[in-house]
Amino acid sequence: MTPRQLLAQARGLIAQRDVATEGVWPRCVAFLARQAVEASVTSFVDRHAPGLRDTPMRAQLIALTALSNRPELARRVVYAWHALSEATHYHAYELAPAVAELEGWIDTVGTFIDAVTPAPITER
């Protein structure tokens, strides 16, 4: 799945909550959104610093802030990745993330994907 498709699935889970998935769907949404971040960051880093492709995500996120021409957006993406990573881990003493938090992180990821995804090549 592409990063955009992953975000679409995450948004779909938010929109179609039901009793059967209560308590589980927020972490599923966070996982899908985090996968979208990781795929888009890896793609961006690979285009700008190919030697970093196989490094851990934390290293790629550090490189992202240095390579991006939109440092504020890069910092927001790094924060979103950390928040989404925390949200994917279950701890009995923690509440799942709220819908507004998830939507905010998803919006940040979507903005980043739009900013860094190259335009498709069209044939004439």
What are these regions (language model features)?
Residues L6-Q9, L13, L32, A39, ...:
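Amphipathic, well-ordered alpha-helical segments in soluble domains
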Residues A15-A20, Q35-V41, R58-L67:
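Short, mixed-charge, low-aromatic patches
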Residues P26-A49:
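Hydrophobic alpha-helical packing segments in soluble, helical-rich domains
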Residues L13-T21, S43, R47, T88-H91, ...:
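Secondary-structure edge/capping motif, primarily at the C-terminal ends of alpha-helices
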Residues M1-V24, V78, T117-R124:
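Charged alpha-helical initiation segments
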Residues M1, P50-R124:
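Long, charged low-complexity segments
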